[in-house]
Amino acid sequence: MAMSLLGITFGIAFFVVTQAQTSGFEAFFIRTILGTNGAIKVSDRFQDMDGTVSRTDQDGKTRFSFRSREESRYTEGIETPHLLRKALSQFKGITGISEILEGNAILDGGSRSYAISFHGIRINDHISVSDLGNQIIIGDLSSFESDKMSVLIGSRIAQRLMISQGDRVTLKGGTGNIQLRVAGMFESGVSQIDKNRIYLHLAKAREFKGERFSGSIFQVGIQNPNVAPQIAAQMQETLGHRVVSWQEREKVWLDVFKALRVSSAITVSSILLLSGLGIFNVFAIMVIEKTRDIAILRSMGFSGSDASAVFLWQGIIVLIFGIIAGTLLGILAT
């Protein structure tokens, strides 16, 4: 009986631990992604702006036809960011909008060079749609905000180039080279970002890339990230731009977490099944050993169902205590 109780206890505890661990990793991943790349991204414009076409028939009625944009071509970037920003602000649930100009360049730290991806941002807008303010590990945002020739670099980039706060670096490529001062380092928790991304001011990024107005994208923050797919679909249909929610962008990783939860549940269920078989064997042997006692109970007027109930209640009590003990053990372990 004790072995059966231990089997249930450790089976439930293992289930709680594995599910909590997977859920914790998933929550951390989602929090990191939302704090870095935002809930929604608005980018390229559809070339066919006739996604919805209205026509007036001979009877005077206006009818609408909808064309699928699945095979549509795109015009790279946003051509009129100020107008699109105004349109985005009209949607409900929007908490912030940040215009970003992306590009690739070479960052020269003096003794070493490294290929990076730069994001031109307006810092006050960007901290409203990201967690950049809490990701700074060296330096501060006020220093970056006050110096238009400054840059924030990923922690992995700083390690590879062996540069520190206040050092001068050169951004090479685009229309030429520009000298920047390192205002700070950030650590997002995503190694791919920390070893490839830098932030500089949007105006300086436009000057470096040679694009005065167009070519940027928008990162949008919303109150409830869980409804991002619905809001993204509304934006795409209304604005005629490619709009991607974080669920669509990170679908592969979210599917991985689902698979991990299912696999761990199957594993633990197998353990519990074995524990159940153990309980069955224990009670089968117990019934055989208690044959004389059962006969005495029957002679005293107890029915067969009454005698069976004694053993069933023993099994239920073992199960309940095992579940409670396993749950508490799992909570303590996590």
Task: Explain the meaning of each model-derived region.
Residues 4-14, 261-281, 315-326:
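Alpha-helical transmembrane segments of integral membrane proteins
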Residues 1-24, 33:
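Short, strongly hydrophobic transmembrane alpha-helices
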Residues 119-122, 140, 152-242:
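Basic-flanked hydrophobic alpha-helices used for secretion and membrane insertion
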Residues 1, 224, 229-280, 286-288, ...:
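Peri-transmembrane interface segments
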Residues 20-28, 32, 283-286, 327, ...:
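Membrane-spanning helices that line or support transport/gating and their immediate boundary helices
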Residues 73-181, 207-208:
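Short acidic/glycine-enriched loop/turn elements at secondary-structure junctions
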Residues 284, 292-334:
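Transmembrane alpha-helical interface segments in multi-pass membrane proteins
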Residues 19-115:
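Hydrophobic, regular-secondary-structure patches
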